[in-house]
């Protein structure tokens, strides 16, 4: 099946579309990436999203407008991907949408909201669309995240038991297919969770203190020019989220601009470079602490944070003897991974197969994820699959 996965992360800077041919061979999911296209949000739409996410207030009218405009933007990127990557032959589109809010009370996720009305995608492309992929997991008591864990477990099964997948987006998340070791009863079940901010607080600081002229630390230049402040870092590390047990999830409903400004009270004399260096060190430390707790021997990293050499250098230092490997070395380009993961989730849904792993999200059971919006071409043709795949093989074109 030829599938397009659509993704925009918590940095809400661009929409990524990855296309792939996906099939099942025995107990193996065979994935052949076809490429990726990416389209930045317009300045107006990005500003509108930023103005609506917590802790800002918004209106039902603004949410309706955003749902439509994000859906139209996703539809345009999907149509481009279908034309440029698939020659117009895509059979299914799987859209994550744009996360606006993750409703968490204590350790329990009570709801999640992704905007980007799928009807616009179906109308523009003629393809059936799988969307709203997180809500079913939440309804079964799960965190609704990290959903990429299903991809990671399939992908890394068969490597060393200490392999851990790490994604550095706005939020950092890890997946340990081996569950961090073995138990007295045998192999441990997979686990996954959000470790905390990756780029979220760095981006917030850069945007705030450059009056919006910059959105992120380009090339890690600010972080490299500064020195982490030991006292501020200790203060940031006192955040209770970091000591919560897994599975757990978080987002910009916690790690946002106002959170950052409150944390910086008493540190007004610090330069922007020192602030960014400290926030970069925070990401490296919290990720490394989480990885070490999983008894990892290898970290396979992907996501936008890999483009920040300062962050990557700090992370290497924090990891010590634990190997840090780019996902590119395993056949999955870092930029494409999340969109590919959602293509796989859409494929699983279309075949009636679970896309969540209960031990990774904390759900009562695994679930078939998402909702279907049929396209004008009708539902995709489905080949009967006797059982869910256990591993994944990446094949080149």
From Swiss-Prot:
ATP binds at residues 9-16. GO terms for molecular function: ATP binding; kinase activity; phosphotransferase activity, alcohol group as acceptor. Pathway: Amino-sugar metabolism; 1,6-anhydro-N-acetylmuramate degradation; Cell wall biogenesis; peptidoglycan recycling. The keyword Cell cycle does not apply. It is an enzyme of class 2 (transferase). Its EC number is 2.7.1.170. The keyword Nucleotide-binding applies. Keywords: ATP-binding, Carbohydrate metabolism, Kinase, Nucleotide-binding, Transferase. GO terms for biological process: 1,6-anhydro-N-acetyl-beta-muramic acid catabolic process; amino sugar metabolic process; peptidoglycan turnover. SUPFAM superfamilies: Actin-like ATPase domain. InterPro entries: Anhydro_N_Ac-Mur_kinase, ATPase_NBD. It holds the Pfam family AnmK. It catalyses: 1,6-anhydro-N-acetyl-beta-muramate + ATP + H2O = N-acetyl-D-muramate 6-phosphate + ADP + H(+). Catalyzes the specific phosphorylation of 1,6-anhydro-N-acetylmuramic acid (anhMurNAc) with the simultaneous cleavage of the 1,6-anhydro ring, generating MurNAc-6-P. Is required for the utilization of anhMurNAc either imported from the medium or derived from its own cell wall murein, and thus plays a role in cell wall recycling. Belongs to the anhydro-N-acetylmuramic acid kinase family. This is Anhydro-N-acetylmuramic acid kinase. It comes from Rhodococcus erythropolis (strain PR4 / NBRC 100887). The gene is anmK.
